[in-house]
A protein has these predicted regions:
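Rossmann-fold NAD(P)H-dependent dehydrogenase/reductase core
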Residues: 23-272, 361
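C-terminal helical subdomain
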Residues: 122, 287-327, 336-338, 352
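Short glycine/proline- and charge-enriched loop/turn segments
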Residues: 211-222, 279-288, 326
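Terminal signal-anchor or tail-anchor transmembrane helices
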Residues: 1-34
Length: 367
């Protein structure tokens, strides 16, 4: 009889696990349906013309950034700003040749080489952007994926430096410069690139009771912790972007911003690129990558649509032609607490090292 009781208990436990436990785990850490949908999605650029507009792309030499630049160039963009740590001169020549061969007009292509591993590189880009007449679209595609821990000149683990801190700082510095041209019917858009990698990393995003949350995530070790750094850095960026969007909404109401601005995130989906190449040597990342991968050109089109969205996309995550929800852990009360903590710790770091960002924070202090 005792064995029958044990058998019944085990059977019940297994049934509960299959019915509730595994689906809950997948929803939290591996929503495979999203990957599957993106793998088979084939978005195309919905905006027919960018005539008169100015577009700035970071990570412009990357697989997504370079393809996005070409998509804009073939749609009559007026000024195309290519930002990367590597010289984008060759990309500029490729674009101009493609347009010449197609009998299309060439845009004004500006090549800004900047090392965004340093905050000074972000400041340099922002200073140059002050000379732009308009700034209709900012697409932040810069990013790194590293399975070996390194430290930036600013003292942060490099994934967190590039994927989060430098992108966030540059976004803040460019925010007051966003302005639509007369032929653009929508408010200017700033889009930060997010990633499915946030989900499997969510289990490692717990906050410490004491000390700096950002430092805890940055002071990681090689191995499994480093393997999650890409996802964790993207989670930080998504938290920041949501908070920034909320604050921009508040200051727009009070007219502290001269015009409406759309802040959103875009998920391009996954593709085999030089960025994701390190996954080839990692079994689980390689299997996940293979399950969801599609052509880089399709991913770039999704990003172009994201940064071309109307004001209805403010504060949302764009995915192909639609929006998608925030990860479950971000929607809980603890997620909103983490968001505020990240915002304040990031502010402390920036204001200590980048004096001009203080004015932007003061403008956003309305909530």
């Amino acid at each position: 009889m005792a064995s029958l009781g044990v058998y019944a208990a085990v059977t019940t436990l297994v049934a509960l696990l299959l019915t509730y436990g595994i689906p809950l785990f997948l929803r939290e850490c591996f929503p495979w349906q999203s990957l599957y949908k993106q793998r088979h999605g084939k978005p195309t650029v919905t905006t027919k013309s960018y005539e008169g507009r100015t577009v700035l792309i970071t990570g412009a030499n990357g697989a997504f950034g370079s393809r996005a630049a070409k998509l804009f160039a073939h749609r009559n963009v007026d000024t195309l700003v290519l930002v990367d740590v590597r010289d984008c001169g060759e990309l500029k020549q490729e674009i101009e040749k493609e347009l010449s061969d197609a009998g299309k007009a060439k845009p004004n292509i500006l090549v800004w080489q900047a090392d965004l591993m340093n905050f000074s590189g972000c400041q340099e880009v922002a200073r140059k952007a002050q000379d732009l007449k308009t700034l209709d679209h900012v697409l932040m595609t810069m990013g790194i994926l590293s399975f070996n821990r390194r430290v930036s000149p600013e003292g942060w683990e490099t994934s967190i430096q590039i994927n989060y801190l430098s992108g966030a700082l540059l976004g803040l510095l460019l925010l007051p410069l966003l302005k639509s041209c007369s032929t653009n019917p929508n408010p200017p858009v700033m889009t930060f690139v997010t990633s499915f990698g946030i989900y499997p990393s969510s289990l490692t995003m717990g906050m410490p009771k004491n000390g700096s949350y950002l430092k805890m995530l940055s002071n990681n070790k090689d191995g499994m912790q480093q393997a999650h750094q890409y996802g964790r850095s993207k989670a930080l960026l998504l938290y920041f972007t949501r908070e920034l969007a909320e604050r921009v909404s508040a200051v727009t109401v009070t007219s502290k911003l001269p015009h409406k601005v759309t802040i959103n995130s875009a998920d391009p989906g996954s593709a085999w690129t030089p960025l994701t190449a390190p996954n080839q040597d990692q079994l689980i990342p390689r299997l996940i990558q293979n399950f969801g991968s599609r052509a880089p050109e399709i991913c770039a089109a999704a990003l172009v649509n994201g940064v071309s969205a109307s004001e209805d996309a403010h504060g949302k995550i764009m995915q192909d032609f639609d929006t998608t929800s925030y990860p479950p852990f971000m929607e809980r009360k603890s997620g909103h607490v983490a968001q505020k903590r990240i915002w304040e710790e990031t502010r402390e770091e920036f204001e200590a090292k980048v004096p001009e960002v203080k004015a932007v924070y003061e403008m956003l202090d309305q909530i």
